Design a protein with these regions (language model features):
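Generic short beta-strand segments
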Residues: 62-66, 101-104, 148-150
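A short, acidic/glycine-rich surface segment
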Residues: 66-71, 105-111, 153-154
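Vicinal oxygen chelate
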Residues: 21-29, 32-42, 61, 82-102, 108-137, 161-166, ...
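Residues embedded in well-ordered secondary-structure elements
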Residues: 12, 25-27, 74, 87, ...
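Core segments of cupin and vicinal oxygen chelate
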Residues: 39-93, 139, 156-158, 164-166
């Protein structure tokens, strides 16, 4: 299996630098980062992957009662127990919310390649040390896809490498950082 993320990453950099349409009127956001929620098949295994393997820190989670989850359109009458993981410090830190909903058997998508189906396809995480991150992930059974880590062109950052791995549910995780 090949990871097509290097081309997508390069395309994103080129598009960001290219002149385009005039910017829309700026919207006011109290926080400029987003949180990402993901339903997982094995909550403990996923929490270990992201904390012990990648380096997220776990914060206090929260519960969403069934009536609220239903009224909001999140579930069909099932409560949610959410584990919150964070990268960084402070209120603007990136948060990953892991959920496993009791009594359900969610279907996995076709995650062979990022172009296999539409929707959010991968997470990009900038790491301080690619080799150390891969060593931690190897202890959890994760290994790089295809021939990664691959060195990125110097124009994208001298000494930066791109590595794709899969989380316990098969989602592609793109790691970018130096090898030490």
């Amino acid at each position: 299996m090949r990871c097509h993320a290097p081309m997508l990453f390069l395309l994103a950099v080129v598009m960001a630098a290219a002149p385009g349409l005039p910017a829309a009127e700026p919207a006011a956001f109290p926080r400029t980062t987003i949180d990402l929620g993901t339903v997982v098949g094995d909550l403990e295994k996923s929490a270990r992957f992201y904390t012990e393997g990648i380096g997220f820190r776990e914060l206090k989670g929260f519960d969403v009662p069934a009536d609220l989850a239903t009224a909001a359109g999140l579930t069909d009458g099932k409560p949610l127990a959410v584990r919150v993981l964070v990268l960084g410090d402070g209120p603007a830190a990136t948060k990953l919310k892991l959920m496993q909903i009791a009594g359900t058997s969610p279907r996995g998508g076709d995650n062979e390649f990022i172009h296999s189906h539409t929707g959010f396809r991968y997470l990009t995480i900038i790491v301080a040390d690619t080799d150390a991150t891969l060593a931690r992930l190897a202890k959890l059974g994760a290994k790089p896809l295809a021939r990664s880590p691959v060195e990125l062109p110097a124009s994208l950052g001298a000494g930066m490498h791109l590595t794709c791995v899969r989380d316990p549910d098969g989602n592609i995780i793109e790691l970018i950082g130096p090898r030490k």
